[in-house]
Amino acid sequence: MNNKKLKRILEVSDDYKQITLPDSRYYQRNGKYYPSVTHVLSHYPKGKYFEDWLKKVGYSSEYIVKKASEDGTKVHNMIELYLNGEEFHFLNEKGIPQYDIEIWKMFLRFVEFWEEYEPTLLETEVHLFSDKLEVAGTCDMVCEINNQLWIVDFKTSNHIHSTYDLQA
């Protein structure tokens, strides 16, 4: 991968140690500790719409968040298989669905993006560090589209959240 393009505020590194604690994750490199972007954003104010949603769903919120995380992991795994050239279908050889229809739809949104923009895949699961922002993290994919470098983190939400741009 051409690392020079990423070095504006990010540096790609394979020389690091990931430290996962019960409520946070840090990356250690060259004697310096970087909090994960996800951990930093967990302290970012969620806003009025999130608060309204919590009031509306009440105790169900834990279940909803857990299911969304599980669904996101399933879609992420499907995308990785797709990027590795694996072929799979919604129906198995007996005509029975192999995937939940909502998970399949989320996966197809990625396929539509991939086919429409025709990116050149450079790397997956890239560990990035920013001395300027003092954070680190792992992006899902680095690719090139129309001669521009893209850092991609797969999302399965139906809405754009205010923290998405902060994660990049």
Residue spans for each PLM region:
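Metal-dependent nuclease catalytic cores that hydrolyze phosphodiester bonds in DNA/RNA
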Residues: 1-136
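Mg2+/Mn2+-dependent nuclease catalytic core
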Residues: 122-168
